[in-house]
Swiss-Prot record:
The modification S-nitrosocysteine is found at residue 93. This is Hemoglobin subunit beta. It comes from Saguinus mystax (Moustached tamarin). The modification N6-acetyllysine is found at residues 59, 82, 144. The modification Phosphoserine is found at residue 44. Keywords: Acetylation, Heme, Iron, Metal-binding, Oxygen transport, Phosphoprotein, S-nitrosylation, Transport. The lineage of its organism: Eukaryota, Metazoa, Chordata, Craniata, Vertebrata. The modification N-acetylvaline is found at residue 1. InterPro entries: Globin, Globin-like_sf, Globin/Proto, Hemoglobin_b, Hemoglobin_oxygen_transport. Red blood cells.
């Protein structure tokens, strides 16, 4: 991902304020509610029968935190996203058979959640930088797909 110095600074400054557990759980929960077909990858998560059930599901929250932990690793290695996400790409492709489009959907949901949490601080410039990052992460996660 090519970010200017200003964009990198905007991304890392805001990310330093992100509650990974809260934002991760909300982002994954919203993905599962807004795009219900993504729920099929989470059969072991128990009750996903309603938006409330999804948003309050402890397994959704825990996995959302894990997902954003990996995203944090990506932010620390913006110049090598493909390398950073190579193993996760392989796992999601070969073992989990996740449609790579879901990575793009989750990235866009994450941007919405960040905008919701940070309001005016999430300026159009910050959003543009984050859109570049989530697109880069989605591409890196899709890299191992045949």
């Amino acid at each position: 991902v090519h970010l200017t110095g200003e964009e990198k600074s905007a991304v890392t400054t805001l990310w330093g304020k992100v509650n990974v557990e809260e934002v991760g759980g909300e982002a994954l929960g919203r993905l599962l509610v807004v795009y219900p077909w993504t729920q099929r990858f989470f059969d072991s998560f128990g009750d996903l029968s309603s938006p409330d059930a999804v948003m309050n599901n402890p397994k959704v929250k825990a996995h959302g935190k894990k997902v954003l932990g990996a995203f944090s690793d990506g932010l620390a290695h913006l110049d090598n996203l493909k390398g950073t996400f190579a193993q996760l790409s392989e796992l999601h492709c070969d073992k989990l058979h996740v449609d790579p489009e879901n990575f793009r959907l989750l990235g866009n949901v994450l941007v919405c959640v960040l905008a919701h949490h940070f309001g005016k601080e999430f300026t159009p410039q910050v959003q543009a930088a984050y859109q570049k990052v989530v697109a880069g992460v989605a591409n890196a996660l899709a890299h191992k797909y045949h």
